[in-house]
Structure formats: C-alpha cells, structure tokens
Regions:
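Short functional linear segments
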Residues: 1-46, 53, 59-66, 71, ...
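Residue-level signal for inorganic ion chemistry
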Residues: 10, 47, 68, 130, ...
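ATP-dependent carboxylate-amine ligase catalytic core
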Residues: 22, 26-37, 63-146, 192-194
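Hydrophobic alpha-helical packing residues
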Residues: 57-62, 121, 325, 368
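Acidic, Mg2+-coordinating active-site environments of NTP-dependent enzymes
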Residues: 125-133, 148-234
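Nucleotide phosphate-binding/pyrophosphate-handling subdomain across enzymes
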Residues: 128-133, 139-152, 157, 213-303
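C-terminal helical cap/extension that packs against the catalytic core
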Residues: 190-219, 294-351
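A glycine-rich beta-strand to alpha-helix segment
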Residues: 340-369
C-alpha cells in the first residue's frame, strides 16, 4: 500500500463518524497479538492541556535518553504529526504499512489511526508511549490497555457534552474510565469532580498523586507532567513544549490558538497583549459553547472578522458567528473565506489573533509557515 492510498482509505472512514464501543478496536488489536499491552504507556485524559502534558512528559523522557512515542491530536500541519517517535513523524511508508494491516477491519477513522499508532510504536521499539485520549476516556478507542504504566489527568471541564455528558461529574466519570487496577494515577491540581477520580482509584486500589497548584494553566500542566516523570524515576524537570496552534506566536504581531471552550478561552487571555488593539479572525464549530468562549475573548478585541472553515459541516457560517459575536464586540464583519479574513485583519496594523477552532488554525497556518 502507498501512503496516498492509506490517506485515501482514512478519508473514506470519515463518514463513519464516532461509534460507541471498544469491540472493534479490541478485535483489530488482537490480530496483532494485542501489541498495545506490550508497551509501557502513559495514558493521558482531560479536557484542556492534554497535549501540553503529553509533550512535557515526552520531553523529560527523551532528555533522560529514553526512546519515546507520542500520540496526540488534532493534527495541524501534517496528518502524520499525530504519531511521532523521538519527535520525528511516522515515515510515510511505515504509516502505509501499518494502515494495510488494518485495512479490512471495520474501524472508524480515529480507531484506525489509533491502531496504527500502537502497532508502529511496538515495531519501533519505544521505551515509553505517551498516549493522549481523543475524547473522553472509558469509551475512547485508545482505552484498550490492560495495564497502563501511569494514568494522568489534565484539567477537566465541559466539552463534547453530546458524547460525554452535560455535567462536569459525568465527564469526569467518563474520563476516569481509563484507570486500571493498581495503576498509579496523577491528577491535575484541584481537579474538578475530584471525588469521582478518588472513588475510582479506591475501587481499583490505585495510588494517587495530586500535582501541586502553580496558579497558571501551563504551569499546572507542567506540574502534572513532573509528577508523571517522578513516578517513572526520571529526575528531570519537564520543559515547556511548543505545540502547533496552542498559543503559537508568529513574530510579534500574530497569535494562533485552537482552543474552543471556555476554559481554553480563559487560558488564552493570559497570553493576549494588554497594550495593543487586537483584531480577531474567528471560526467555531456549532457544537461548542459559543457564548462561553466569545464572552471571554471578544471584549479584549477591537474588531472581529468572523469566518468559517471550508468543507467542515460542523462549522458555523461566517454570518451566524458574526451575529453571535456582535454581543461582545461592536466592530464585527463576516468573511467566509478564512484567507481573505486574515488579509482583512492585517489591514490596520493591529495585533492579530486567529482563534476558536483547530480546524481554522490548520487552514490559516498554511499561510504563515
């Protein structure tokens, strides 16, 4: 199978959407000898900050001279960036070879990518695999591990409520489902619905460490990573990872951020300039907490260009998003083409914020690199 054929097969899987249950994944992995259970896996769940925790843990392990695989989503620039070993993307032919193993399995898109990840990490002989849950926990297709080495939790908040539940407690219960008997667990500082996690840990006889609060979302994520490294016997402070579309700066005049929920908005505010007018290029998916995001970010903006994401059915139209945005910023225009929206934002010399969606970040980042 060629890389192009592998990507085409994955695109064909997109129409399957999200399907409940782990039976398809377990059956597919069983045909490989359940190689996921031959890996030392740090399994990371949460609503915000999972990618930072994963990257920081991997950084510490690499500096301790371990060979480390990382699985993190969504991708921004290259599809293969979701699966890396020692910071290098899975080679195209290796990707195609792993896809071919599962080509006839009835897997969804994300299930197929996850199966490829576990097989590639096994074939690559990684010392550790740092695996980020895609969504949720108990029902997430990464959750086919009999005995993860450590389970870690980033911040838990409301998101993906149609799939995970409409309360923080329900979401925490779903995410805590990655915990396995006897597995050490690391919790985000003052994690929401902590009793849910503690109850699960007591039931499964799991030792629990709560990271110390640092007072800043990024520092709190690093504290979680630091506790994971300590449990692994690594005496190295985690470095601050630079991740695409996570408060990513392009020069002094543009910030690209894919956060899309109220907690992500609150973290973003800490990185916005207070002494310059801000022009926001904004797109959002219709299933997000639109008002909860906009009410925090847009009062900091002088003007907003609402746009959309071509070919993304879940994206709000530019006009509908502009109507919602006018509640929080008086100067709002709609421009359906995101590239023209960026050009319009640059017209007055303001600080530019591109925000609201990883899909928008993926589209715009092509103009910036």
């Amino acid at each position: 199978m060629t890389y192009e054929a592998a990507i085409q097969l994955i695109k064909q899987k997109q129409s399957l959407g999200v399907q409940p249950g782990l039976s398809r994944m377990l059956a597919a992995m069983e045909k490989t000898g359940s190689v996921q259970n031959k890996l030392q896996v740090i399994h990371v769940a949460g609503t915000n900050g999972k990618g930072t925790v994963c990257a920081a843990v991997a950084d510490g392990l690499r500096r301790a001279e371990y060979r480390v695989g990382v699985f993190s989503s969504p991708w921004v620039t290259d599809f293969r960036e979701q699966i890396t070993v020692d910071g290098r993307m899975i080679p195209k032919q290796d990707f195609a070879d792993c896809v071919e193993v599962f080509a006839k399995e009835p897997l969804t898109e994300f299930e197929l990518i996850t199966a490829v990840m576990y097989l590639y990490f096994y074939r690559s002989g990684v010392d550790y695999a740092v695996v980020e849950c895609g969504m949720g926990g108990a029902g997430d297709c990464t959750n086919v591990l009999a005995h993860p080495t450590v389970c870690a939790f980033a911040k838990v908040a409301l998101d993906h409520m149609a799939f995970l539940g409409d309360t923080v407690e329900a979401i925490a219960r779903e995410k805590s489902g990655i915990i396995k008997p006897g597995c050490p667990v690391v919790l985000y500082p003052l994690i929401a619905a902590k009793d849910v996690f503690l109850e699960q840990c007591r039931a499964l006889n799991c030792p629990v460490t709560e990271a110390a609060q640092q007072g800043d979302p990024i520092a709190d994520d690093l504290a979680v990573a630091g506790e994971v490294l300590r449990l692994l016997g690594v005496d190295t402070a985690p470095g601050l990872p630079m991740l695409p579309a996570r408060r990513e700066h392009f020069g002094e005049n543009l910030l690209l951020d894919g956060a899309h929920n109220p907690d992500g908005a609150a973290a973003l505010l800490l990185h916005l300039p207070t002494d310059r007018p801000i022009a926001a290029v904004l797109a959002m998916m219709e299933d997000k907490d639109i008002d909860g995001y906009l009410c925090q970010v847009l009062p900091r903006c002088r003007r907003v260009i609402a746009t959309t994401v071509p070919g993304m059915g879940r994206a709000l139209s530019a006009e509908d998003l502009a109507a919602a945005a006018r509640k929080y910023c008086p100067d709002v225009t709609a421009e359906p083409n995101p590239h023209r929206a960026l050009a319009a934002a640059k017209a007055d010399g303001d600080f530019i914020l591109v925000c609201g969606s990883f899909y928008l970040a993926r589209e715009i980042r092509k103009d910036l690199i």
